[in-house]
Amino acid sequence: MRKTIIFIILLFSAVSNGQENSLSDEQMNSSGANKVEFADGDEEIQKLAKLDIENQIPFLLLQGGIDQMISYKDQKFEEKFKIYFFNYGCIAPSEKVESIYNQVIFNYLFAKYGKSWIKEIRKDIPGFKEFKKSH
């Protein structure tokens, strides 16, 4: 019985420490991804994305809706390339706004990882098709 309890404690501590890729509420609330829908123009949207990169919390913005769930494959992508998917749900900024933000993040991924991430990324992210055409 004692061995079982020790095993359970060790298991829970390993699982809780394995969640490296989660953000605090403060990081989420202060992120550019959270503020992008209120940005005043393309340059401010790009600036918010660059700030998220500098703060080591780059996001890829997803159009909302039920079909935009973040899958296990997406979570593996997040871990591997050190980014976060941001799903607004049903009320999201325009696809144009998301595309402008995402273009900055795509360029960051390209500069840091080359083309390796392109094969693994989900293809429905706003702005991805345009980015892929130009690279």
Give the label of every model feature segment.
Residues 20-135:
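Short beta-strand and adjacent turn/loop elements
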Residues 1-23:
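Bacterial Sec-dependent N-terminal signal peptides
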